[in-house]
Amino acid sequence: MAVDKGFKKIPGSYKYKIASEPWEFEAIHNLNYKTFVEEIPQHKKCLDRKLIDKFHGENRYLICVHGEILLGMIALRDRRPLSLDLKIGNLEAYLPPFKSILEYRLLAIKEEYRNSSVFAGLMKMAFNTALRKGYDVAVISGTTRKARLYGHLGFKPFGPFVGGHGAIFQPMYIDITSAFEFKKNSRVLTG
């Protein structure tokens, strides 16, 4: 994998895609470790500094890369039970009626790219995927530090907080039709 020392942020050179290459999955495991072990203490440390998600085989990873450098990712999963089902139980009790549900998981962006277009590009791709595949509702466990940002995208909080030990998350949902309307009117997610 390429080393990104001295890389300049050039938005036109970002590529958004579904992860498919071995190096991309390796980079995903490394970014998961950095984000969800070192930064947000959700999992225990390990010597190989990799975190392979327990639903890895079922996840569809949407990624942003520059060459062979992973800048950010989000995982999509629709197989029940969702991780939020396991954390709070009966999701249907908290959500408006829906026919199909998608979970956005493991949103992670390299620290030096968090104030770039990477987040918006990943969310645009996630919304487009949900709309194209016919999902009614998407859910996410958003870190409480970024709950306001998710709110600006149209996500609504529901249910109790989940997590613990310095990693508190707010379950949130978005009606996919609303997300599409928001996307049409958003300067951030258009283009």
Where are these regions (language model features)?
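Cytosolic beta-strand hydrophobic patch enriched in CBS
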Residues: 61-65
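Short, functional N-terminal and low-complexity linear motifs
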Residues: 1, 91-96, 114-118, 137-139
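Conserved acetyl-CoA-binding loop-helix of GNAT-fold acetyltransferases
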Residues: 114-128
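Conserved acyl-donor/pantetheine-binding loop and adjacent beta-alpha core of acyl/acetyltransferases
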Residues: 70-114, 163, 191
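Terminal substrate-recognition subdomain of acyl/acetyltransferases
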Residues: 1-40, 49-58, 69-70, 74, ...
